[in-house]
């Protein structure tokens, strides 16, 4: 990646229309972040320490906990730093790093949810062959594939964004460095980067959405064939948690990246939901309501 820029740092403007609320936001977001760290560490510890939880479903839940820890830590610590009265400045390299890991982990999230939908599809539609199909090798390959796709995605968008010259304005209208906020600061035509970013994010989101839709269509057909009401309820409750998490994850992507001109305030609120609230809720949605995990927590 070549550096054409005279800009050595960017200024994160933070959340629009929140002047005077810094102390309240610092307390609120610090509480959310602490709950995110504690909840996901507890879930990860329970899954690793209990042999009863060494199953495909909990293997992917463990990956989700690792993702949530990393995803929230990409943007939240810097936000808490300047909300506490410190500088809003972020170095050029820090901005590059933040954007890379945000898209790396964000893409990984989409494909991880897709893999988890496929796992539920096999568990409900082929229960007798579940352990044979979702063996250790398959699970490892699927998990590794999600992280690799996320890495390639970020390695495409990050150089494309920062190969442009940044020679003047350096105020980022977000609370972290992301493509919609950074690209307008470039001193050169950004149409190519915008088209590639839109196509990349949109295509990957559609692929994941299509695979999830197919999986849950098959799951719905299988559930409708279950004769006992208790069996249908159990299968549905297993899938409802995953569907809830998918809605929380895909909503921000659709609003932020597939709208031509999202408002700064709306964008910030949705990004906070995606970056901070969803990782905090995932342990509750997926695991803390699960009796197996509850019984194995330290």
UniProtKB/Swiss-Prot annotation:
GO biological process, one term: detection of chemical stimulus involved in sensory perception of smell
GO-annotated molecular function: G protein-coupled receptor activity; olfactory receptor activity
Disulphide-bonded residues: 95-187
Sequence ranges on the Cytoplasmic membrane side: 45-52, 119-137, 216-235, 289-298
Domain of life: Eukaryota
Glycosylation sites: 3
Keywords in alphabetical order: Cell membrane, Disulfide bond, G-protein coupled receptor, Glycoprotein, Membrane, Olfaction, Receptor, Sensory transduction, Transducer, Transmembrane, Transmembrane helix
Membrane topology: Multi-pass membrane protein
Xref: SUPFAM superfamilies: Family A G protein-coupled receptor-like
Annotated TM spans: 24-44, 53-73, 98-118, 138-158, 196-215, 236-256, 268-288
Segments in the Extracellular topological domain: 1-23, 74-97, 159-195, 257-267
Record Gene3D superfamilies: Rhodopsin 7-helix transmembrane proteins
Pfam families xrefs: 7tm_4 (PF13853)
Keyword Chloroplast: no
Subcellular location as annotated: Cell membrane
Gene Ontology cellular-component annotations: plasma membrane
Primary site of residence: membrane
Homology family: Belongs to the G-protein coupled receptor 1 family.
Function description: Odorant receptor.
Protein name: Putative olfactory receptor 10D4
Organism name: Homo sapiens (Human)
């Amino acid at each position: 990646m070549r550096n054409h820029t005279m800009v050595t740092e960017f200024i994160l403007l933070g959340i629009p229309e929140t002047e005077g609320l810094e102390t309240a936001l610092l307390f609120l977001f610090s509480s959310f972040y602490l709950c995110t760290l504690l909840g996901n560490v507890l879930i990860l510890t329970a899954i690793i320490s209990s042999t009863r939880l060494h199953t495909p479903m909990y293997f992917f839940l463990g990956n989700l906990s690792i993702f949530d820890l990393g995803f929230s830590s990409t943007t939240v610590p810097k936000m808490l730093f300047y909300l506490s009265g410190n500088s809003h400045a972020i170095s050029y390299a820090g901005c590059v790093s933040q954007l890379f890991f945000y898209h790396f982990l964000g893409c990984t999230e989409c494909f991880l949810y897709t893999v988890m939908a496929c796992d539920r599809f096999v568990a409900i539609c082929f229960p007798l062959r579940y352990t044979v199909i979702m063996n250790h090798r398959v699970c490892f390959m699927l998990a590794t594939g999600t992280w690799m796709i996320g890495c390639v995605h970020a390695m495409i968008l990050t150089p494309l964004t920062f190969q442009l010259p940044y020679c003047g304005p350096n105020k980022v209208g977000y609370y972290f460095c992301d493509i919609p906020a950074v690209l307008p600061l470039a001193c050169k035509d950004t149409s190519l980067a915008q088209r590639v970013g839109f196509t990349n994010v949109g295509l990957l989101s559609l692929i994941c959405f299509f695979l999830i839709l197919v999986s849950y269509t098959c799951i719905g057909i299988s559930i409708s064939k279950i004769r006992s009401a208790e069996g249908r309820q159990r299968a549905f409750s297993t899938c409802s948690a995953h569907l809830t998490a998918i809605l929380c994850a895909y909503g921000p992507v659709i609003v932020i990246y597939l709208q031509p001109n999202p408002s700064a305030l709306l964008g910030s609120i949705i990004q906070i939901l995606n970056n901070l609230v969803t990782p905090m809720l995932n342990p509750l949605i997926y695991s803390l309501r699960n009796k197996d995990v509850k019984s194995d927590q330290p």
